[in-house]
Structure formats: C-alpha cells, structure tokens
C-alpha cells in the first residue's frame, strides 16, 4: 500500500479536539470556532453570521459541528447562510472535523463552524 502525505495549501486542517478546544493548523482555539479559507477565528454562535456571509463566495458548503451529538441548526441561521450561497450540513463536531479534512484534502471549497465537544 502506498501512503502519501496530504499537503494543505492555504486552508488549515483540524488536527485534534477535546473538551472545549480545537487544534487547527498547529494552534489551539478554545470554545466555538470558525474555520474559513481566510483563516480561523472564535465564533460567536448562531447569531454571528457576518463572517460566514462575507466568506460565502469562497465556500460551497459549510459544515456545522453541533458539539457531541447532532442537532438541527436554528432555521434563521440556515436561511441566512443558504441565501448567501453555500449549503449547510449539520453533524456532530467530531464528524464535521473529519468530513472537513477529507474534502479540504481534495481541494474542495469548504468552511467549518464548530461548537465544542
């Protein structure tokens, strides 16, 4: 079996997570976190859509990690993001991290909004 190391260009992969934190691109972020092609930042939750709407033209899908278990996102949040362009996919945060990394490694245009586990 041939193993090849994945190289990420500008976007940063999720390298790990734990209770209340995410390790992304070699840095640790505590609490809710937003990962976009433009960078990684603290996320204010579902009322904080400004950065997501601003990045809408640079992503095709936004993965929303809902914490330990999957749960629906608020309808107003989903509507605001989808009106700006990208699709919204919800899942548990660990699953969202893995899915984001796989699609990022394929060169896809993805974003990630995470609630901590």
Give a label for each model feature:
Residues 83-115:
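C-terminal structural segments of small proteins and small subunits
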Residues 1-46, 105-117:
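Non-catalytic interface/targeting segments
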């Amino acid at each position: 079996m041939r193993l090849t190391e994945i190289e990420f260009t500008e976007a940063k992969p999720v390298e790990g997570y734990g209770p209340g934190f995410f390790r992304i691109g070699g840095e640790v972020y505590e609490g809710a976190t937003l990962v976009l092609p433009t960078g990684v930042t603290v996320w204010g939750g579902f009322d904080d859509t400004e950065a997501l709407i601003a990045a809408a033209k640079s992503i095709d899908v936004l993965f929303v990690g809902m914490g330990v278990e999957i749960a629906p996102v608020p309808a107003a949040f989903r509507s605001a993001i989808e009106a700006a362009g990208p699709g919204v996919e919800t899942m548990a945060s660990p699953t969202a991290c893995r899915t984001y990394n796989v699609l990022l490694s394929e060169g896809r245009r993805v974003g990630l909004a995470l609630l901590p586990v």
